[in-house]
Protein backbone atom coordinates (compact mmCIF):
# COMPACT_ATOMS: atom_id res chain seq x y z
CA UNK A 1 0.00 0.00 0.00
CA UNK A 2 1.19 3.50 -0.88
CA UNK A 3 0.85 4.77 2.68
CA UNK A 4 2.80 1.93 4.34
CA UNK A 5 5.97 4.04 4.51
CA UNK A 6 4.22 6.96 6.18
CA UNK A 7 3.49 7.61 9.82
CA UNK A 8 -0.07 8.58 10.75
CA UNK A 9 -0.30 11.81 12.74
CA UNK A 10 -3.14 13.93 14.08
CA UNK A 11 -5.57 15.39 11.58
CA UNK A 12 -4.97 15.43 7.86
CA UNK A 13 -1.21 15.34 7.78
CA UNK A 14 1.36 12.61 7.39
CA UNK A 15 5.04 12.35 8.18
CA UNK A 16 7.40 10.52 5.87
CA UNK A 17 9.97 8.24 7.45
CA UNK A 18 12.47 11.08 7.04
CA UNK A 19 10.09 13.15 9.22
CA UNK A 20 9.02 15.47 6.41
CA UNK A 21 5.52 16.73 7.19
CA UNK A 22 2.95 16.69 4.41
CA UNK A 23 -0.07 18.79 5.30
CA UNK A 24 -3.40 18.56 3.56
CA UNK A 25 -7.08 19.34 3.81
CA UNK A 26 -8.03 15.65 3.94
CA UNK A 27 -6.56 12.17 4.10
CA UNK A 28 -7.16 11.88 0.34
CA UNK A 29 -5.21 15.11 -0.25
CA UNK A 30 -2.32 13.75 1.83
CA UNK A 31 -2.41 10.44 -0.06
CA UNK A 32 -2.21 12.32 -3.37
CA UNK A 33 0.86 14.22 -2.13
CA UNK A 34 2.47 10.97 -1.00
CA UNK A 35 1.81 9.40 -4.39
CA UNK A 36 3.25 12.43 -6.22
CA UNK A 37 6.37 12.30 -4.06
CA UNK A 38 6.94 8.64 -4.96
CA UNK A 39 6.57 9.04 -8.73
CA UNK A 40 9.40 8.84 -11.23
CA UNK A 41 7.84 11.57 -13.33
CA UNK A 42 7.28 15.27 -12.72
CA UNK A 43 4.39 17.72 -13.01
CA UNK A 44 4.66 21.15 -14.65
CA UNK A 45 8.29 22.29 -14.53
CA UNK A 46 9.16 19.75 -11.85
CA UNK A 47 9.63 22.20 -8.99
CA UNK A 48 7.57 19.89 -6.76
CA UNK A 49 9.41 16.71 -7.82
CA UNK A 50 10.70 14.84 -4.75
CA UNK A 51 11.60 11.47 -6.25
CA UNK A 52 14.97 9.78 -5.99
CA UNK A 53 16.24 9.91 -9.57
CA UNK A 54 19.90 10.98 -9.72
CA UNK A 55 20.87 10.44 -13.36
CA UNK A 56 21.06 13.02 -16.16
CA UNK A 57 19.77 12.72 -19.72
CA UNK A 58 23.24 11.62 -20.85
CA UNK A 59 23.61 9.08 -18.03
CA UNK A 60 25.88 11.12 -15.77
CA UNK A 61 25.57 10.75 -12.01
CA UNK A 62 24.34 13.79 -10.07
CA UNK A 63 26.59 15.59 -7.58
CA UNK A 64 25.25 15.90 -4.05
CA UNK A 65 23.62 19.31 -3.47
CA UNK A 66 25.67 19.79 -0.29
CA UNK A 67 28.97 19.03 -2.06
CA UNK A 68 31.22 21.56 -3.79
CA UNK A 69 33.20 18.89 -5.65
CA UNK A 70 33.65 18.87 -8.56
CA UNK A 71 31.43 21.96 -9.03
CA UNK A 72 31.17 24.89 -6.62
CA UNK A 73 27.65 26.34 -6.58
CA UNK A 74 25.10 28.38 -4.62
CA UNK A 75 22.16 25.94 -4.79
CA UNK A 76 22.65 24.38 -1.35
CA UNK A 77 20.08 22.90 1.05
CA UNK A 78 20.78 25.87 3.35
CA UNK A 79 20.18 28.44 0.60
CA UNK A 80 17.04 26.70 -0.69
CA UNK A 81 15.50 25.04 2.40
CA UNK A 82 12.14 24.28 0.72
CA UNK A 83 13.54 22.88 -2.54
CA UNK A 84 14.14 19.34 -1.29
CA UNK A 85 17.86 19.43 -2.08
CA UNK A 86 18.47 16.02 -0.52
CA UNK A 87 21.39 13.75 -1.40
CA UNK A 88 22.14 13.97 -5.13
CA UNK A 89 18.51 13.74 -6.27
CA UNK A 90 17.25 15.62 -9.32
CA UNK A 91 15.50 18.85 -8.35
CA UNK A 92 14.44 22.20 -9.80
CA UNK A 93 15.24 24.83 -7.15
CA UNK A 94 15.35 27.73 -9.63
CA UNK A 95 12.16 27.07 -11.66
CA UNK A 96 14.01 25.92 -14.78
CA UNK A 97 12.10 23.95 -17.45
CA UNK A 98 12.52 20.58 -15.66
CA UNK A 99 14.44 18.89 -12.82
CA UNK A 100 18.22 19.00 -13.16
CA UNK A 101 21.42 18.52 -11.18
CA UNK A 102 25.10 19.35 -11.09
CA UNK A 103 27.04 16.39 -12.45
CA UNK A 104 29.96 14.47 -10.98
CA UNK A 105 31.77 14.95 -14.31
CA UNK A 106 34.25 17.85 -13.89
CA UNK A 107 33.82 18.71 -17.59
CA UNK A 108 30.00 19.06 -17.46
CA UNK A 109 28.66 21.46 -14.80
CA UNK A 110 24.96 20.55 -14.95
CA UNK A 111 22.34 18.76 -17.03
CA UNK A 112 18.63 18.11 -17.03
CA UNK A 113 17.67 14.79 -15.51
CA UNK A 114 16.46 11.64 -17.21
CA UNK A 115 12.85 12.07 -16.10
CA UNK A 116 9.56 12.13 -17.98
CA UNK A 117 6.63 14.45 -17.51
CA UNK A 118 3.71 12.70 -15.86
CA UNK A 119 1.15 11.54 -18.44
CA UNK A 120 -1.61 13.94 -17.40
CA UNK A 121 0.78 16.83 -18.14
CA UNK A 122 1.70 15.59 -21.64
CA UNK A 123 0.66 17.68 -24.56
Curated annotation (Swiss-Prot):
Q: Reply yes or no: does the keyword Hydrolase apply.
A: yes
Which BP terms does GO give this entry? blood coagulation; fibrinolysis; proteolysis; tissue remodeling
User: Which keywords does UniProt give here?
Assistant: Blood coagulation, Disulfide bond, Fibrinolysis, Hemostasis, Hydrolase, Kringle, Protease, Secreted, Serine protease, Tissue remodeling, Zymogen
Q: InterPro entries from the xrefs?
A: Kringle, Kringle-like, Kringle_CS, Kringle_sf, Serine_protease_kringle
Any domain commentary?
A: Kringle domains mediate interaction with CSPG4.
Task: Look up and give the organism this protein is from.
Answer: Capra hircus
| Disulfides per UniProt | 41-118, 62-101, 90-113
Molecular-function annotations in GO: serine-type endopeptidase activity; signaling receptor binding
Similarity section:
Belongs to the peptidase S1 family. Plasminogen subfamily.
The first-level EC class reads hydrolase
State what this protein does. Plasmin dissolves the fibrin of blood clots and acts as a proteolytic factor in a variety of other processes including embryonic development, tissue remodeling, tumor invasion, and inflammation. In ovulation, weakens the walls of the Graafian follicle. It activates the urokinase-type plasminogen activator, collagenases and several complement zymogens, such as C1, C4 and C5. Cleavage of fibronectin and laminin leads to cell detachment and apoptosis. Also cleaves fibrin, thrombospondin and von Willebrand factor. Its role in tissue remodeling and tumor invasion may be modulated by CSPG4.
**Do you know which PANTHER family this protein is assigned to?**
LIPOPROTEIN(A) (PTHR24261:SF2), PLASMINOGEN-RELATED (PTHR24261)
Q: Where are the bilayer-spanning segments?
A: none
Q: How does it assemble?
A: Interacts with CSPG4 and AMOT. Interacts (via the Kringle domains) with HRG; the interaction tethers PLG to the cell surface and enhances its activation. Interacts (via Kringle 4 domain) with ADA; the interaction stimulates PLG activation when in complex with DPP4. Angiostatin: Interacts with ATP5F1A; the interaction inhibits most of the angiogenic effects of angiostatin.
Hydrolase as a keyword of this entry, yes or no, is yes
Name the UniProt record assigns to this protein: Plasminogen
Q: Which residues form the Kringle domain?
A: 40-118
Origin, by domain of life? Eukaryota
The misc remark on file is: Plasmin is inactivated by alpha-2-antiplasmin immediately after dissociation from the clot.
Inhibition and activation profile: Converted into plasmin by plasminogen activators, both plasminogen and its activator being bound to fibrin. Cannot be activated with streptokinase.
Classify the main location: secreted
Amino acid sequence: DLLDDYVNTQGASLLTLSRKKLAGRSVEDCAAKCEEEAQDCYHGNGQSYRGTSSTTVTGRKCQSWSSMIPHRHQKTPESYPNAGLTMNYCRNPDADKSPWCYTTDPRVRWEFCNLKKCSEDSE
